[in-house]
Amino acid sequence: MRGKCLCGGVEFEVRDPPQRLYQCHCSLCRKQSGAASNAAFIVRSEQLVWLAGQELVSSYVKPTGFRSDFCSKCGSPVPNPLRSTSYVWVPAGLLEEPVGLSVAMHLFIGSKASWEPTPVSGALHEEVPAFSEVLKGLRA
């Protein structure tokens, strides 16, 4: 499974990807993505292979630790390591080919944008479940 940013400068491949993703509806993810929710999945660090443009990746880290990596040319969010883990967050919107991913869960559903309808598929969570439960849900 391959992906790249809007300008094509940053490219990556995900090996043995999950078949499911999550959508986060928190205000940080809305601001980071510019959309009503942020669709993504999580993989082990060794499953992500950078193919091009790693030198174009810039990071913004809030004092709370929230991190957003992005292409310094086009601004697209790009994969970034999850703090204190051996996992990487991968934004699903960067994927190149049709991948058939389904939504396993919605996070921070109580914080969803007022214009966004309540999702009808996937588990609904008011906050983030334990990390092990998120991983389990993405692999189910």
Where on the chain are the PLM-derived regions?
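A short Gly-Trp-Pro
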Residues: 1-140
